[in-house]
Amino acid sequence: QEDVRAAVAYLADSGIRHIDLAGYSFGAWVNALAVNDGLKIDNMIMVSPPVAFIDFTSIANLGNLKLIVTGSRDDIAPAGMVEKMYPTWNPAAKFEVIQGADHFYGGYEGKLEAALMDFIASKCSS
């Protein structure tokens, strides 16, 4: 969390007014903990939050969580587990499952990129 907080503070001190976070696997958990503990950001993306491996039960009410992506074959971030948990994080967040992808998205990088870029483009145009 200290690294995330330091990076966000650096950006804010540099005059960046809108700060978004994206984290993959362990990074999704670290970002969620920091935001859950009060770190102020605008939007957050979680890619394959490792709910089968790390306890996410203390994380709730992440109003800035906008997108969660996982793969249908991800055994570290199983779609069914993530789908049950994300309403406690933010029921308004978009939940996307990439069919056939495992935790590492091998062969599905283009689909992951498309999901992320579609979301980012929608935020940039609004």
Language-model features: where?
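A conserved short beta-strand
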Residues: 40-51
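Catalytic histidine-centered segment of alpha/beta-hydrolase-like enzymes
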Residues: 101-113
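Alpha/beta-hydrolase active-site loop
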Residues: 1-14
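Gly/Ala-rich beta-loop-alpha elbow adjacent to hydrolase catalytic centers
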Residues: 23-31
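Short alpha-helix in the alpha/beta-hydrolase fold that links the catalytic acid
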Residues: 64, 78-86
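Catalytic histidine neighborhood in serine/cysteine hydrolases
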Residues: 88-104
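Short beta-strand/loop motif that positions the catalytic acidic residue
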Residues: 62-63, 67-70, 74
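Acidic catalytic loop of the alpha/beta-hydrolase fold
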Residues: 72-77, 103-104
